Swiss-Prot record:
CDD domains: Ribosomal_L20. Binds directly to 23S ribosomal RNA and is necessary for the in vitro assembly process of the 50S ribosomal subunit. It is not involved in the protein synthesizing functions of that subunit. One of its GO terms (molecular function) is structural constituent of ribosome. Belongs to the bacterial ribosomal protein bL20 family. GO terms for cellular component: ribonucleoprotein complex; ribosome. It comes from Leptospira biflexa serovar Patoc (strain Patoc 1 / ATCC 23582 / Paris). The keyword Cytoplasm does not apply. This is Large ribosomal subunit protein bL20. The lineage of its organism: Bacteria, Pseudomonadati, Spirochaetota, Spirochaetia, Leptospirales. The gene is rplT.
């Protein structure tokens, strides 16, 4: 009886790893051992950066809001406080979009918050 060497499973496992490493440079896309470690590392970076992306976007939104609010003679922190006291429930993502794409609407919101309550 011939010896079974698990050929198809072995080949499929390698093929799967090399498919994930497609587009990597040099041996990282051709050689199984280096491709395997490159795919593992890429997965770690992807996992880390999916979490990092959330804080990066929040920073971007705050920067955009701050720039737009300062054009109207107000600081970011005072603007956010005024929004809370006036009961305007808009999140930073929406405010940043308004500041970036719909300036006149954003300016109207800023003017509304400037009015004393």
């Amino acid at each position: 009886m011939p010896r079974a060497v698990n050929g198809t499973i072995h080949k499929n496992r390698r093929k799967k790893v090399l498919a994930k490493a497609k587009g990597f440079r040099g041996g990282r896309s051709k050689l199984f051992r280096t491709a395997k470690s490159a795919v593992m590392k890429a997965g770690q970076w992807a996992y880390r950066d999916r979490r990092k992306k959330k804080s990066e976007f929040r920073k971007l939104w705050i920067t955009r809001i701050n720039a737009a609010v300062r054009e109207n003679g107000m600081s970011y922190s005072k603007f956010i406080h005024a929004l809370k006291t006036h009961g305007i429930n808009l999140d930073r993502k929406t405010l940043a979009d308004l500041a970036y794409n719909h300036k006149e609407v954003f300016n109207a919101i800023v003017e509304k918050t400037k009015v004393a309550k």
